[in-house]
Amino acid sequence: MRVDADDFARPCSCGREHQIAVKEILIEAGAVEKLEEEMSEGMLREYISSLVICDTNIYAATEELMEDIYDRCQVLVLDAEGLQADRHAIKIVENNMEEDIDLILAVGAGTIHDISRYIAHNYKVPFISVPTAASGDGFVTTVAAITLDGVKKTVPSVAPICVYADTDIFSKAPQRLTAAGISDLMAKYICLADWKIANLVTGEYFCRETVKLEEKALKTVKSSIQDITEGEEDECEQLMYALILSGLAMQMIGNSRPASCAEHQVTHLWDMEVINGPLDALHGEKVSVAALLVLEEYKRIAAAITQGRCHAKPYENEDEELLKETFGKKGLLEEIRKENEPELLETISPQHLEKCLNGIEEIIDELPSEQTMFRLLEKAGCAKTVYDIGLDESAVLPSLR
């Protein structure tokens, strides 16, 4: 399957002309052979000093299929044990990469891609995406989720110039990784609702065509969950296609708004380990658990609006003590304050918010019920409860605050 990126780079009904940086997207068996051909005699032959970034698990799984590519590149294999997209991993790459690198190949899943795109951005070199699992939607985005000085941030980075997703590789990834990809997509229900509410309340820029793209990704996966979980190659390709569509939606907007909202903020809090210890869970697993928690809270708010129990009041920074208690003990308080400036809530009057309540209720009512979402995730083998990711029940309330 070849995805024509030009289909997404055109004048849009939202009034903007979306920019797409990726030149080629290939999702099929033998895609890495096409990559090797392009590096040898095609559009990538101009790059003469390429760096592959992968981890120990990925190297072992791809060594045979990608032997010719590895032979022509500097290959940097990071220890998969405890690997995070953080300053430590970035320093390892920077300290070991050759000075004349002119192309980076990210061979792996989400963590490897975040590290690679961040390095590519900082060193102003292009990168190629070689996804090895359909585990998330970050392969073609222009942002990276990086932990810097203890704070999980979404930082500007670069999109790949090409994607070579080889079905012979990613369809054979552990089912847990595939389930994590389904989890990441199912959370888009929350993301799109958040974006619609922000547009309603603050007038934030909103693109209906991008929303349709995310909805197409959701529909693609929902209709094929059973076959995807059974490892059917054609359906795994559809999952990868849906994840790349979601990433293209972010690339079109220029940030993560269409695909990362309240549920991702909750997971970033967990990643910072200020209200919990280390979690042995994949990003997608944390996202599906957070999405269910947020969905339950949203449905509770919608019910309160319906019953006339929800009213707007002037914004007051009532959580200062909670912030101090949560982030102060790790010396992160000032950095967190900077991340959240300016405080948007200060600009929203209670009168305006009160007028928006019915619209907010309507948007939330469009979301699937908690039971429907739970069953979808259960069918796909996704994480659903805090216990599934090793989180204590006591962390739920501060996570939502």
Enumerate the language-model features and the residues they cover.
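A conserved active-site cap/scaffold subdomain adjacent to cofactor or substrate pockets
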Residues: E215-A303
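Solvent-exposed alpha-helices and their adjacent loops that cap or buttress functional pockets
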Residues: E17-Q19, L44-R45, N96-E99, A120, ...
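C-terminal charged capping/lid subdomain of soluble metabolic enzymes
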Residues: M1-R16, I305-R401
